[in-house]
């Protein structure tokens, strides 16, 4: 009792991985989850229902009789083609689905490609539904449940969607290491009654099964549907679910039909609810809920083909009714109807959320490839193809906090405790009185039944002993008779062979006679039918001939009336011709008048054109004068531009001469510097030569005693030579710098000349458009150009000056370094040769004199370089002043030319304004002439319009007169043929159809013989030979009628026979 209460009420310990609830609480929570869901995924709104099609292979019986296949599946293109024969033509209908699986597909292929993603979405928190739909015997239950489990517990290869989904769910949850709880429900819908397949088996069965109350289907206020009192099994492993599934499937109602040996007679819904615990970043524990509904629908069936009778027929009717309601719901959803008939069936109420609701739905449509099931297959394909267009709006279920779940569970436990206390108040299990009486009666009946079965068992045991003894005696007798039987069989075979030959000959002769009689009877019957039909046709021909004579008389009367009408029409034609000629004359006179007026208008237009040409000539003369005035102004501007060009060229030439003069003066200055430097070097060389002679003499005197002094003197001589070589290289560098500066100046002057010429050319081109503005811009550009050139010259001069200063400083540094080296050398010589002081003093004095002479020469060269620098600076200042004076003179000349140009422009503008005013007066005069010409033309057009109006009125009167004459002739005088009532009325003629004529023809003899032989074989199979001989004539007549109905389409036409 406690285990039953634990399963029903869900009273278990509240571990983190298990949060079970009772059935009522589950329904309330599911409704709350649907109404309060806030975690919506915008991408999943408006998702179409996924439709998968699966075609089963041919059964063994179908393959044995070679049943034609009318369904072809293209899995790559996801398309199904159904071959249908209409009016003798084969027509293929194509249907496209989300996934297509042909007869060769396996359970694993279907699950991996179509169902596996749906299971992942369930674990993400969605509600998903998978249901199989199709005709009975097409494999719905096999697809959903698969084959039976193996005894060793291995997972079967042909497992269906439900066991594979369960296995995948547990594998994923175990791999993630998640804390979860799972519960399942399994219900059955049979004859519109819901029963729980997981309800516990009670020890006492109900006497009448109909007295068992079905489970109630309830709705909340928000449109959701839930089943009250449904059992929920809490599971923790996949094997538990497999056992529950086997137990529930065993309780389902199944029966054998002609189409399926084990056909499901009810709909089943297997639901799996999963609660998964998650931890938020804030550390709170949340419960995520997902639900998977796996629906196995009962198949629609044709009662005539399934062989259902009585109770089974009622079951089939209820199944077809619920599936028909499902089809109506699908049609209404696809057509967006205002009313969806969910409440017409409990099946559609249960699937309400799956069709157009918040659930992700997958439909597996199963079909048969056999031609015998083509009608049901096409119906399934149409409904499945329509279901593709249903749009659901799936939403993720709201995550619940663990504390809220535990609070609800505690309140549920308190409620169940109160119910248990109320039930056990009276020291035992309390049950109703009626139930107790019923159970006692059933116990008594059960005891009586057990006694009766025991008696039957004893009697059957005695009978078994007797039968065993009889069996032993029969075995001995069988062994004796078997030998006799073998001998008798050999004789029998010989006799049978001879008898078979005689019977075969007799049968052939008798069959030939009967066949001839059958053919003759059919020929006589056809002859009689032909004679009767010929008499009928003769009667129809006589009545038709009388009708033809009456028609000829009517045609003669109509000819007379037509002759009178033809004369009347000719008379009307002559009158109409006369009136049209009169109308033509009137129109011709009006046209001549208009031609005269047009001639007058033409003359006026010619005078207008001559006046207009004179005014045009006058305008042309004025324009030529204006052109001459404009040309004179342009010539004046050209003269000013020429003067400006001359002034610019003179300015540039003076500037060029000044620059060349500056370069010549600079060259002369550097030549003077070079000559002075050469003289200085020559003096130094001569002094050095003298010093060398003195040193040689001194060395010869002191060679023996002072060899080290000679070496030192040689080193001094080397240093001095190097110094003068350095001085020579610096002088060479100075000469190169001067030449480089000269070339740079020439290059910049040439660039300045090119820029000046380009600027002058541009100004000359632009002076004609914007003279005043461009003159100011020209002066500014020229001033900038000259300033830039002067600036460049200054920079080059300053650069050269700095270069010269650098060379001078380098020379001074080298001189000072040599001086320092010399002093060091003297100190060393003085310290090392102290003992030779007397001899060295004379040489020292001479060397001091030479050194002083060298210092004087050095100071003199430094003075010369300073003078050169000062002269360069003064030359630069003079050059800048001269260039500034030249530029100022050019700017003053350009200013004078600009004033002259502005006066010339103003005078040209005055002349142009005067010419423009005179041109405007001439244009006004021309416009006045145009207005005068328009008034004259209007004065001519007005009388023309009046004449046209008068002509229009006369033309209308003539037309009215012609219309009256036509009506009088064609309506009053025209004779109409009156009916004489002698014309034969239309009556239906009994024309024999081609089918009736074909029915009169006797079938071919081969066909008659074939039908006769078939009828004879069927009668022989029934073993009624005597009755066949007595009723031979009746059988022949029946075989003839059957033959005519069978071969009516293949008869020859009667014309071909004749």
UniProtKB/Swiss-Prot annotation:
GO biological processes: microtubule-based movement; mitotic spindle assembly; spindle elongation
Region (Disordered): 1-43
Gene behind the chain: KIN5D
UniProt family annotation: Belongs to the TRAFAC class myosin-kinesin ATPase superfamily. Kinesin family. KIN-5/BimC subfamily.
Entry-linked PROSITE patterns: KINESIN_MOTOR_1, KINESIN_MOTOR_2
GO molecular function: ATP binding; microtubule binding; plus-end-directed microtubule motor activity
Free-text function comment from the UniProt entry: Responsible for microtubule translocation. May be important for the organization of phragmoplast-specific arrays of microtubules. Plays an essential role in stabilizing the mitotic spindle. Required during mitotic cytokinesis.
Record has ATP-binding as a keyword: yes
UniProt keyword list: ATP-binding, Coiled coil, Cytoplasm, Cytoskeleton, Microtubule, Motor protein, Nucleotide-binding
InterPro entries, per database record: KIF11-like, KIF11-like_kin_motor_dom, Kinesin_motor_CS, Kinesin_motor_dom, Kinesin_motor_dom_sf, P-loop_NTPase
Keyword presence, Nucleus: no
Organism: Arabidopsis thaliana
Gene3D superfamilies the UniProt entry points to: Kinesin motor domain
Localization of this protein: Cytoplasm, Cytoskeleton; Cytoplasm, Cytoskeleton, Spindle
Membrane-spanning intervals of the chain: none
Top-rank taxon, per record: Eukaryota
Disulfides per UniProt: none
Residues that bind ATP: 134-141
Name recorded for this polypeptide: Kinesin-like protein KIN-5D
GO cellular component, as recorded: cytoplasm; mitotic spindle; spindle microtubule
Comp. bias (Basic and acidic residues): 22-32
Coiled-coil residue spans: 438-517
Kinesin motor domain mapped to chain residues: 48-390
């Amino acid at each position: 009792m406690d285990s039953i209460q634990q399963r029903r009420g869900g009273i278990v310990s509240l571990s983190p991985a298990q949060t079970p609830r009772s059935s009522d609480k589950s329904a309330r929570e599911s409704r709350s989850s649907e109404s309060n869901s806030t975690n919506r995924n915008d991408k999943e709104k408006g998702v179409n229902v996924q439709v998968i099609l699966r075609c089963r292979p041919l059964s063994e019986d179908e393959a044995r009789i070679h049943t034609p296949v009318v369904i072809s599946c293209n899995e790559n293109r996801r398309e199904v083609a159904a071959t249908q024969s209409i009016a003798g033509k084969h027509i293929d209908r194509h249907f496209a689905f989300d996934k297509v699986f042909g007869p060769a597909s396996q359970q694993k292929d279907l699950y991996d490609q179509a169902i596996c993603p749906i299971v992942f979405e369930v674990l993400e928190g969605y509600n998903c539904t998978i249901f199989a739909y199709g005709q009975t015997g097409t494999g719905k239950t096999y697809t959903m449940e698969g084959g039976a489990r193996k005894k060793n517990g291995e997972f079967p290869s042909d497992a269906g969607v439900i066991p594979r989904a369960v296995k995948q769910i547990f594998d994923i949850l175990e791999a993630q290491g998640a804390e979860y709880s799972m519960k399942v429900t399994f219900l059955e819908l049979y004859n519109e009654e819901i029963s729980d397949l997981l309800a516990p088996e009670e020890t006492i069965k109900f006497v009448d099964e109909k007295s068992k109350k079905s489970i109630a289907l309830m709705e909340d206020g928000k449109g959701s549907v839930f089943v009250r009192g449904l059992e929920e099994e809490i599971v923790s492993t996949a094997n538990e679910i497999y056992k529950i599934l086997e137990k529930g499937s065993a309780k389902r109602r199944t029966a054998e039909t002609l189409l399926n040996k084990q056909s499901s007679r009810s709909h089943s819904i297997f639901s799996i609810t999963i609660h998964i615990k998650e931890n938020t970043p804030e550390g709170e524990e949340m419960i995520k809920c997902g639900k998977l509904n796996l629906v196995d629908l009962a198949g629609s069936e044709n009662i005539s083909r399934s062989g259902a009778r009585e109770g089974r027929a009622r079951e089939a009717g209820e199944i077809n009714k619920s599936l028909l309601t499902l089809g109506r719901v699908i049609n209404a959803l696809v057509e967006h109807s205002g009313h969806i008939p969910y409440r017409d069936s409990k099946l559609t109420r249960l699937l309400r959320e799956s069709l157009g609701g918040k659930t992700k739905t997958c439909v597996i449509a199963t079909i048969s490839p056999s031609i015998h099931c083509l009608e049901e297959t096409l119906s399934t394909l149409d409904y499945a193809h329509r279901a593709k267009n249903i749009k659901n709006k799936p939403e993720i279920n709201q995550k619940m906090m663990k504390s809220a779940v535990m609070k609800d569970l505690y309140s549920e436990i308190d409620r169940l405790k109160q119910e248990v206390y109320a039930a056990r108040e009276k020291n035992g299990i309390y049950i109703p009185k009626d139930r107790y009486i019923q159970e006692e009666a059933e116990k008594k009946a059960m005891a009586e039944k057990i006694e009766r079965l025991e008696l039957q068992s004893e009697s059957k045991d005695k009978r078994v002993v007797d039968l065993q003894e009889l069996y032993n005696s029969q075995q001995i007798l069988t062994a004796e008779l078997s030998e006799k039987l073998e001998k008798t069989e050999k004789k029998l075979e010989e006799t049978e062979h001879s008898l078979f030959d005689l019977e075969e000959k007799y049968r052939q002769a008798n069959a030939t006679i009967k066949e001839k009689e059958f053919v003759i009877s059919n020929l006589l019957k056809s002859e009689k039918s032909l004679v009767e039909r010929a008499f009928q046709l003769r009667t129809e021909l006589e009545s038709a001939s009388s009708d033809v004579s009456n028609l000829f008389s009517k045609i003669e009367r109509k000819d007379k009336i037509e002759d009178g009408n033809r004369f009347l029409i000719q008379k009307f034609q002559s009158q109409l011709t006369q009136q049209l000629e009169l109308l033509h004359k009137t129109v011709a006179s009006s046209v001549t008048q208009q031609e005269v007026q047009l001639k007058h208008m033409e003359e006026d237009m010619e005078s207008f054109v001559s006046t207009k040409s004179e005014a045009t000539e006058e305008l042309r003369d004025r324009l030529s004068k204006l052109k001459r005035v404009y040309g004179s102004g342009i010539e004046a501007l050209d003269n000013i531009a020429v003067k400006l060009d001359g002034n610019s060229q003179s300015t540039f030439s003076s500037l060029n001469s000044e620059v060349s003069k500056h370069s010549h003066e600079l060259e002369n200055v550097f030549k003077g510097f070079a000559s002075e430097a050469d003289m200085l070097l020559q003096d130094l060389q001569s002094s050095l030569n003298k010093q060398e002679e003195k040193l040689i003499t001194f060395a010869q005197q002191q060679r023996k005693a002072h060899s080290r002094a000679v070496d030192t003197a040689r080193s001094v001589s080397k240093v001095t030579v190097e110094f003068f070589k350095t001085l020579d290289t610096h002088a060479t560098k100075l000469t190169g710098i001067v030449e480089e500066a000269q070339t740079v100046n020439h290059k910049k002057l040439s660039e300045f000349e090119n820029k000046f010429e380009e600027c002058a050319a541009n100004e000359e081109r632009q002076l004609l458009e914007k003279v005043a503005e461009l003159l100011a811009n020209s002066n500014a550009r020229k001033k900038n150009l000259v300033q830039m050139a002067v600036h460049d010259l200054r920079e080059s001069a300053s650069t050269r000056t700095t270069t010269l200063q650098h060379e001078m400083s380098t020379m001074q540094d080298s001189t000072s370094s040599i001086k320092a080296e010399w002093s060091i050398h003297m100190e060393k010589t003085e310290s090392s040769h102290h003992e030779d002081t007397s001899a060295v003093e004379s040489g020292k004095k001479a060397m001091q004199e030479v050194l002083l002479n060298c210092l004087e020469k050095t100071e003199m060269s430094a003075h010369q370089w300073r003078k050169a620098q000062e002269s360069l600076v003064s030359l630069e200042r003079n050059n800048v002043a001269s260039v500034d004076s030249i530029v100022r003179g050019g700017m003053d000349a350009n200013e004078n030319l600009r004033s002259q140009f502005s006066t010339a422009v103003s005078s040209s503008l005055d002349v142009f304004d005067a010419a423009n005013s005179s041109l405007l007066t001439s244009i006004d005069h021309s416009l006045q002439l145009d207005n005068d010409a328009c008034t004259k033309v209007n004065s001519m057009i007005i009388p023309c319009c009046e004449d046209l109006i008068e002509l229009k009125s006369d033309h209308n009167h003539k037309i009215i007169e012609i219309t009256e004459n036509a009506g009088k002739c064609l309506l009053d005088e025209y004779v109409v043929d009156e009916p004489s009532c002698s014309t034969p009325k239309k009556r239906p003629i009994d024309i024999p159809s081609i089918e009736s004529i074909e029915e009169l023809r006797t079938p071919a003899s081969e066909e008659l013989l074939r039908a006769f032989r078939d009828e004879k074989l069927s009668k022989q199979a029934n073993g009624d030979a005597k009755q066949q001989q007595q009723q031979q004539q009746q059988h022949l007549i029946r075989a003839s009628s059957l033959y005519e109905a069978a071969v009516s389409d293949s008869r020859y036409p009667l014309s071909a026979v004749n």
